[in-house]
Amino acid sequence: MNLQDVILTPVVTEKSQDLETIGANSKKGTRMVKYTVKVHVDANKTLIKEAFKKIFKVTPSSVNVQVYRGKIKRFRNMPAPRPHWKKAVVTFRDGASIDFAKEA
């Protein structure tokens, strides 16, 4: 799998925005910033870490992954499944910042 295809989009929710700002504003010795992104379904933690190293030139300290199963919805009285998707929460130490709009 190409590393450019691993990271799809940033997840913009209230909780993901709180994870970014809480880590950046911490008063402890190490500042940990967490970014939430939507990744390819077949990507694993090591591929996600390598993709961040290559694309954004920063090394993540940890990667947490969650898989979401697509729900079955109805369209014109027929069941139509939504696709499965995967979310990754990537943690950086020392307040590393990423600009997703610049790298797109």
Curated annotation (Swiss-Prot):
Q: What does the protein in this record do?
A: One of the early assembly proteins it binds 23S rRNA. One of the proteins that surrounds the polypeptide exit tunnel on the outside of the ribosome. Forms the main docking site for trigger factor binding to the ribosome.
GO process terms (BP): translation
The answer to keyword rRNA-binding applying to this record is yes
Question: What name appears for this protein in its UniProt entry?
Answer: Large ribosomal subunit protein uL23
Family, according to the entry, reads as follows:
Belongs to the universal ribosomal protein uL23 family.
Q: Which GO terms describe its cellular component?
A: ribonucleoprotein complex; ribosome
Q: Which GO terms describe its molecular function?
A: rRNA binding; structural constituent of ribosome
- Xref: InterPro entries: Nucleotide-bd_a/b_plait_sf, Ribosomal_uL23-like, Ribosomal_uL23/eL15/eS24_sf
Which Pfam families would you find in this protein's record?
Ribosomal_L23
- State whether it acts alone or in a complex, and with which partners, per the record: Part of the 50S ribosomal subunit. Contacts protein L29, and trigger factor when it is bound to the ribosome.
List the gene name.
Answer: rplW
Specify whether Secreted is a keyword of the entry. no
Q: Record's superkingdom?
A: Bacteria
Keywords, A to Z, come to: Ribonucleoprotein, Ribosomal protein, RNA-binding, rRNA-binding
